[in-house]
Amino acid sequence: MAAPRASLRLVAPVWNRGTSGIRGLSKAVDPEGSQKKGRTLLQFLTDHFYDVEAVREYLLRKQVLKVQKKNRSFTYIKERYGPYVAGAYFVLKQGGAVKFRDREWMRANEQGLSSLEFRKLQEVPVEAVDASGCAINYQGLDNLLALKELQSLSLRRCPHVDDWCLGRLYQLADSLQELSLAGCPRISERGLACLHHLQNLRRLDISDLPAVSNPGLTQILVEEMLPHCEVLGADWAQGLKVGPEEQSRDAASSPIPAWPSAPPHQARSLPGCAERPTAHPSGSVGLTQLGGSGWGEGRRA
């Protein structure tokens, strides 16, 4: 009998481990345990949802403060070296480029600009600024509006330039000749209406403005507002409704033949079919859809 007892002592740990595994498996498939686990997950999400919102607000606030820091005024540089150097330093620090009179385009390198270069350009006015893609906002325009001899300004794809910023460009009306606003997501037709002060403009780029509701009509009105300016942007017919005469003319000139209609005797043989009149879309365009003031009289037919 000793041999069977010894064998039982050897087999007992293995059997206990197996039964514990079965008990653990029964706990895993227990419906009450799964419900408790679901409640725990929901409680976890509920407890940390406010924390996620707090982190999101913190990151957004941090981004706003970063943009404000980039658009601060360099008062010390302006007082010591003048407005030309201060404006150029502001643009170069954001990754843009500037062009002083009778000089080549200047961009900041990894080491930046030395004070000796600023002293040499202290009395040289800035004629052109390329701030494409820079984080310039309403506050940061203070550094550019002091450049009274500025002739060319590029604000392409600036994410923070909006209609309020365009309302301040009248301060450059005496010198500004070229302006690029292409790709600015916050500029609408209301902001473009503020450009009527810039009568010395010779070239204006308003292409790819997603906030403009009717690009074709907007370009027509801008051309009437600035008659001596070359306006670049969307096609004049983009967003306009085509009248019945234009539709019939386009159908006649189309290389694709129209679908052949049924003969009259076949149409009459169908019982209960009445002839339906063809509805033509209206060709009128409401100028009040732009919603902006300052455009003046629109184009009349």
Curated annotation (Swiss-Prot):
Task: Give the region (Disordered) as residue ranges.
Answer: 242-301
Compositionally biased intervals (Gly residues): 289-301
Q: Which UniProt keywords are listed?
A: Mitochondrion, Phosphoprotein
Question: What biological process terms from GO does the record include?
Answer: mitochondrial respiratory chain complex I assembly; SCF-dependent proteasomal ubiquitin-dependent protein catabolic process
Q: Gene3D superfamilies annotated for this entry?
A: Ribonuclease Inhibitor
Q: Is Glycosyltransferase tagged as a keyword? A: no
- Which InterPro entries does the record cross-reference, listed alphabetically? LRR_dom_sf
- The source's superkingdom equals Eukaryota
SUPFAM superfamilies in the record, alphabetically?
RNI-like
Q: Where, per the database record, does this protein carry Phosphoserine?
A: S254
User: Which compartment or compartments is the protein found in?
Assistant: Mitochondrion
Write out the GO cellular component annotations: mitochondrion; SCF ubiquitin ligase complex
Family, according to the entry, reads as follows:
Belongs to the ATP synthase subunit s family.
Summarize the subunit comment.
Interacts with incompletely assembled mitochondrial NADH:ubiquinone oxidoreductase complex (complex I).
What's this chain's function? Required for the assembly of the mitochondrial NADH:ubiquinone oxidoreductase complex (complex I). Involved in the assembly of the distal region of complex I.
Name the UniProt record assigns to this protein: Distal membrane-arm assembly complex protein 2
Organism, per UniProt?
Bos taurus (Bovine)
Which taxonomic lineage is given here?
A: Eukaryota, Metazoa, Chordata, Craniata, Vertebrata
Gene this protein is translated from: DMAC2
